[in-house]
């Protein structure tokens, strides 16, 4: 009871209680962080395979004269990473929070967001740049030295609003955004990020400088995957990096996610049984894995195929064989097709993955004549649209099989 009035004794008791808990260390936090975020480019020079775009933006970075921008291209090519890296080099860590607003337009796509959140941020006065000194490194590898914040980061007199997946915005929201861009262009710059530039209305696109992000070539993507695997001390079998890029269809973000999933799968057997208790609060505890030791097991091609949901070659071959006529009568073997499709759906294979792999299997088969390939292209495109529209997967794949078999049986 006497210790209750002793402030020093109470502080010591609180310190001992907090030290008895096992906090999540910085190393633990980094281990649990998605590799996509962990290895996101911090500067423009770290962005891969977009040389022309990076060259133009680097010139803009030096002059601090930024136009409204429109980044478009396939997913996983570095569009969002590029604008965030540019903003970090312009403002530094202190001004990023107050000068940059990032919105995912696929979640907040209505006109109310443009009228409220975007407009409110655009009309805000600029925050003052810090006056203290920061540490900087010599580009030639010399010793670090202290410089003013404004000398390291240019801190131009405008804010940046990043609208990710802007092609998901409604027409009304895009029209409202056009007026907002005109009104607050003196102190705000907009960067629209999208996959399909045709879904951006012309009045909005004409106000922006367009930057096309091309799909990463095989060499750059494989090199980046190998670098991350080396940094994470993950061992890969021969050809695994190339397979990761192939199953990801050039999407580097997806390839890195597959790599992390495979690394966790390989290390699961090693970390099992070595879990430790972490005190979350005064009563609750949580089991977490300790930082895993360097993996002695390598990631194989079979594990990548399993994680990516790639249909095994024997399963796909049985489906394609059922589509080709066996006899001279050239009749559709419906029962065989229906049985194979039923088994594939029961095993849980994705219908979209089935369509994608079957397309490559059939369209690149030398036994199929060119005139038939023209008709098959229409069949595959119709099935793909039905799946996108939410059609039943079993019926869509069965219909695809029957229609493809019908084209192949034609004389």
From Swiss-Prot:
ATP binds at residues 36, 40, 73-81, 195, 253. It is found in: Nucleus. Keywords: ATP-binding, DNA replication, Nucleotide-binding, Nucleus. One of its GO terms (biological process) is DNA-templated DNA replication. GO terms for cellular component: DNA replication factor C complex; Elg1 RFC-like complex; nucleus. Its main location: nucleus. The keyword 4Fe-4S does not apply. The keyword Nucleus applies. Residues 1-36 are annotated as: Disordered. GO terms for molecular function: ATP binding; ATP hydrolysis activity; DNA binding. The elongation of primed DNA templates by DNA polymerase delta and epsilon requires the action of the accessory proteins proliferating cell nuclear antigen (PCNA) and activator 1. Subunit 2 binds ATP and single-stranded DNA. Heteropentamer of subunits RFC1, RFC2, RFC3, RFC4 and RFC5 that forms a complex with PCNA in the presence of ATP. Belongs to the activator 1 small subunits family. This is Replication factor C subunit 2. It comes from Phaeosphaeria nodorum (strain SN15 / ATCC MYA-4574 / FGSC 10173) (Glume blotch fungus).
């Amino acid at each position: 009871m006497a210790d209750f009035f002793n402030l020093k004794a109470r502080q010591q008791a609180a310190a001992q209680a907090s030290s008895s808990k096992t906090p999540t260390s910085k190393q633990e936090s980094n281990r649990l962080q998605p590799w996509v975020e962990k290895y996101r480019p911090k500067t423009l020079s770290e962005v891969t395979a977009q040389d022309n775009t990076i060259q133009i933006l680097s010139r803009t970075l030096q002059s601090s004269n930024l136009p409204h921008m429109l980044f478009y291209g396939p997913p996983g090519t570095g569009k969002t990473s590029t604008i965030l890296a540019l903003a970090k080099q312009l403002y530094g860590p202190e001004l990023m929070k107050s000068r940059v607003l990032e919105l995912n337009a696929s979640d907040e796509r209505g006109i109310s967001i443009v009228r409220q959140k975007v407009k409110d941020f655009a009309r805000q006065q600029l925050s003052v740049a810090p006056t203290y000194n920061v540490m900087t490194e010599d580009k030639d590898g010399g010793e670090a030295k202290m410089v003013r914040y404004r000398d390291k980061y240019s801190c131009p007199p405008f804010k940046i609003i990043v609208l990710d997946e802007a092609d998901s915005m409604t027409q009304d929201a895009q029209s409202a955004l056009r007026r907002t861009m005109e009104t607050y262009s003196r102190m705000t710059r907009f960067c629209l990020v999208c996959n399909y530039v045709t879904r951006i209305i012309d009045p909005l696109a004409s106000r922006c400088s367009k930057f096309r992000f091309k799909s990463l070539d095989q060499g750059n993507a494989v090199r980046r995957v190998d670098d991350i695997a080396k940094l994470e001390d993950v061992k890969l079998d021969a050809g695994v990096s190339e397979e990761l890029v192939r199953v990801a269809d050039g999407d580097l973000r997806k390839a890195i996610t597959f790599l992390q999933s495979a690394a966790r799968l390989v290390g699961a057997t090693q970390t099992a049984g070595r879990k430790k208790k972490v005190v979350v609060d005064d009563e609750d505890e949580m089991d977490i894995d300790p930082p895993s030791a360097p993996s002695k097991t390598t990631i194989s091609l079979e594990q990548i195929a399993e994680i990516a949901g790639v249909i095994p070659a024997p399963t796909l071959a049985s489906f394609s064989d059922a589509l080709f006529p066996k006899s001279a009568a050239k009749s559709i073997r419906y029962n065989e097709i229906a049985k194979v499709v039923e088994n594939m759906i029961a095993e849980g294979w994705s219908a979209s993955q089935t369509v994608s792999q079957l397309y490559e299997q059939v369209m690149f088969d030398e036994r199929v004549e060119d005139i038939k390939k023209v008709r098959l292209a229409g069949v595959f495109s119709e099935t793909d649209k039905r799946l996108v529209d939410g059609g039943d997967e079993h019926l869509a794949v069965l219909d695809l099989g029957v229609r493809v078999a019908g084209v192949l049986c034609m004389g």
